[in-house]
């Protein structure tokens, strides 16, 4: 009974192992496919230049391979697809005129751009082959580093200062890495030496005399390297002499500022005096200008007096006070004896005592010059500003005129008694 039961179970186990045996037989047969190799897995490219993504494949088939290059992104980008070296389809605009394929499947990408950086995958298949070969190559694209420089606020520093900063600067370059050198050797680790996260800035805290040296920086990226010229940092020791000189300089500076502050008000007062002097001069000039019309008017009146002396005499006579009575102008007394054979008529009542008595019989008068005209022409013109002299001259003219009239009256005709 036991033997009969074991026979069916063995047959069932053999049936279960049959597929695995078949698979083992298949694996032991030689496989036909494409084998791809590449001399490099990483290529560094420069912007504007070309990069060769080199591969080689091997196959038992003599047919042309189907080659496909892709740039791996979140969504793969097909760069080119071809049969042999003949491109299939249309290239993307950003790859047009920049792609070239070789018979071994290699890709030449010219005029590199920063956007070309990434991982490229190639697939090569042959229709007769069962399997397709694949290979990936990484491409980096960078800008060369320009010559760097070390920037410092000052090349001199005082010992035990708070901090001193050095900055490594350069204009061009991508993916830079910085290294600091002291006297041409890499900077040793020191608690006083602090580097920024990108190591571009070096800060020395609590400067010591041993920090007096040459400093430089090295900048590099995958395709280039640059080294800055060394910068000499001079550290001065603190001393009593330096402190004294510093104190003296501060004192002189404060004194200079004080003197300048005191000098400014004096300049303002000087300007004020000058302004007052100018105002006074302008006032005097204005006063002279006001007096000039009056001075010009007075001489004109003198000229008018010269042209019309009689009018001047009449005006002056009216304006001048009454002249004093001259005893010489009084008439001769009636009791005064006349010449023999003549009788004098008595004075007419009501006449002014100053007027001469005229006789009934008249004789022709002797010609006489006009006293006013002669006197007026002989008198000089009145000067401006001398009224007293003009009045005395008018009085003299009036007195002279009265005398002449009296003389003419006295010399006039008298009655002859029969």
Swiss-Prot record:
Subcellular location per the Swiss-Prot or TrEMBL entry: Cytoplasm; Cell membrane
SMART domains given for it?
Answer: IG, IGc2
Q: Where is the composition biased (Low complexity)?
A: 385-400
Which loops or segments lie on the Extracellular side of the membrane, by the record? 34-240
Which of the residues are on side Cytoplasmic? 262-418
After translation, how is this protein modified? N-glycosylated.
Q: Which residues cross the membrane?
A: 241-261
Glycosylated positions are: 35, 138, 167, 189
GO CC terms: cell-cell junction; cytoplasm; plasma membrane
Q: Which Pfam families match?
A: Ig_3 (PF13927), V-set (PF07686)
Give the range the annotation lists for the signal sequence.
1-33
Key words, A-Z: Cell adhesion, Cell cycle, Cell membrane, Cytoplasm, Disulfide bond, Glycoprotein, Growth arrest, Growth regulation, Immunoglobulin domain, Membrane, Phosphoprotein, Signal, Transmembrane, Transmembrane helix
Q: Which residues are annotated with the PTM Phosphoserine?
A: 280, 352, 379
Q: Is Cytoplasm one of the keywords UniProt gives this record?
A: yes
Q: Where is the composition biased (Basic and acidic residues)?
A: 287-308
What membrane topology is given?
A: Single-pass type I membrane protein
Domain Ig-like V-type: residue ranges: 34-141
Ig-like C2-type domain location is: 148-234
Please list the disulfide bridges: 168-217
Q: Does the keyword Transmembrane helix apply?
A: yes
Segments of this protein annotated with the region Disordered: 271-418
Gene Ontology biological-process annotations: cell adhesion; immune response; regulation of cell cycle
Q: What is known of its domains?
A: The cytoplasmic domain plays an important role in regulation of cell-matrix adhesion and cell motility.
Q: How does it assemble?
A: Homodimer. Dimer formation occurs predominantly through cis interactions on the cell surface. Part of a complex containing MLC1, TRPV4, AQP4 and ATP1B1. Interacts with CLCN2.
- Give the function comment from the record: Involved in regulating cell motility and cell-matrix interactions. May inhibit cell growth through suppression of cell proliferation. In glia, associates and targets CLCN2 at astrocytic processes and myelinated fiber tracts where it may regulate transcellular chloride flux involved in neuron excitability.
Q: What name is this protein filed under?
A: Hepatic and glial cell adhesion molecule
């Amino acid at each position: 009974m036991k033997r009969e039961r074991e026979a069916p179970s063995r047959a069932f186990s053999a049936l279960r192992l049959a597929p695995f045996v078949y698979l083992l037989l298949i694996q032991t047969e030689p496989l036909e496919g494409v084998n791809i190799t590449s001399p490099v897995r990483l290529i560094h490219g420069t912007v504007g230049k070309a990069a060769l993504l080199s591969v080689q494949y091997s196959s038992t088939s003599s047919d042309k391979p189907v080659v496909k290059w892709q740039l791996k992104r979140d969504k793969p980008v097909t760069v080119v697809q071809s049969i042999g070296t003949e491109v299939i389809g249309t290239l993307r605009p950003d790859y047009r005129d920049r792609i070239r394929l070789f018979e071994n499947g290699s890709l030449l990408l010219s005029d590199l751009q920063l956007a070309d950086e990434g991982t490229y995958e190639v697939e090569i298949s042959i229709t007769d082959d069962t399997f397709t070969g694949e290979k990936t190559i990484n491409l980096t694209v960078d800008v060369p580093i320009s010559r760097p420089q070390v920037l410092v606020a000052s090349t001199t520093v005082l010992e035990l200062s708070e901090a001193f900063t050095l900055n490594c600067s350069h204009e061009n370059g991508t993916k830079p890495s910085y290294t600091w050198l002291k006297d041409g050797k890499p900077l040793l680790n020191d608690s006083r030496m602090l580097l920024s996260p990108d190591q571009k800035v070096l800060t020395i805290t609590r400067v010591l005399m041993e920090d007096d040296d040459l400093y430089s920086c090295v900048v590099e990226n995958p395709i280039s390297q640059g080294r800055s010229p060394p910068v000499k940092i001079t550290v001065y020791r603190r001393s009593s002499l330096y402190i004294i000189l510093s104190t003296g300089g501060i004192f002189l500076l404060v004194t200079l500022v004080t003197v300048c502050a005191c000098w400014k008000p004096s300049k303002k007062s000087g300007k004020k005096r000058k302004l007052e002097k100018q105002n006074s001069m302008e006032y005097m000039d204005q006063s002279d200008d006001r007096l000039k019309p009056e001075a010009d008017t007075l001489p004109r009146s003198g000229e008018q007096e010269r042209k019309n002396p009689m009018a001047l005499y009449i005006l002056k006579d009216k304006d001048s006070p009454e002249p004093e009575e001259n005893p010489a102008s009084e008439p001769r007394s009636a009791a005064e004896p006349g010449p023999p054979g003549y009788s004098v008529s008595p004075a007419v009542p009501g006449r002014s005592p100053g007027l001469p008595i005229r006789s009934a019989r008249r004789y022709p008068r002797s010609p006489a010059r006009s006293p006013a005209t002669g006197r007026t022409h002989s008198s000089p013109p009145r000067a401006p500003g001398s009224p007293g002299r003009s009045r005395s001259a008018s009085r003299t003219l009036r007195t002279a005129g009265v005398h002449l009239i009296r003389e003419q009256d006295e010399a006039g005709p008298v009655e002859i008694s029969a």
